[in-house]
């Protein structure tokens, strides 16, 4: 694909109009249209700004892409996953999980995954299904998977969570404060240290990272992908060690380590 086709493709993926891009760059929408038709090319300053607006690297805009594959944001229907998780929770009397599922669906209503039209609830349901597929049928784990983002992303309070105190504590452990460039290392160091002391929180966090690694190619910029790789390399060995040292999670630890390290290796080679 040409530079113009790349610009158009990334703009449409971000659900931006030519007018919106033009406003961000302080140019006319006709200029953006001419770039996408390959009649003209943006100058260097415009190209850098354009990459920032579209949240991609400059090379992603200018390099000709020979092979275009059809991709999809979601593999399973989230409503089908919800039915599966609720049915399993009923069968195994996971009462906290049953309440957590409905609470999470309502809390995340109207939210989408980054750079997609996929409802956000797809993510926690994916985590719950991942745990169940590894034969981890624990009320605290399934409920924790469903609720792990509601405090951070939905402006909810711990006291409002319809679950027992152990699950509330797991959610608290998995929630980290907002960071800045100045305090990010300090906050993340304390965050992962806290997680590594709790086997259930460690397991959920590893499942969460598996899901985030599989979706970050369409949800994150190249710089954010790079940061995610570095963060995973730095902190996950310690969290994974906690999962491995918990006998009932031994099989899950093998699968999770394989998935995380395989995904990391793929991204590193492609980066």
Kindly give the residue locations of the regions a language model identified.
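DNA major-groove recognition helix of helix-turn-helix/homeodomain DNA-binding modules
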Residues: 26, 45-60
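Short basic helix-loop element that most often maps to the first helix and adjoining turn
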Residues: 5-24
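Active-site helical microenvironments for divalent-metal-assisted chemistry
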Residues: 68-271
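Short coil turns linking two alpha-helices in DNA-binding domains
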Residues: 17, 28-31, 43, 57
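Recognition helix of helix-turn-helix/homeodomain-like DNA-binding domains
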Residues: 25-41, 63-66
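Short amphipathic helical patch at the helix-1/turn junction of helix-turn-helix
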Residues: 1, 12-13, 41
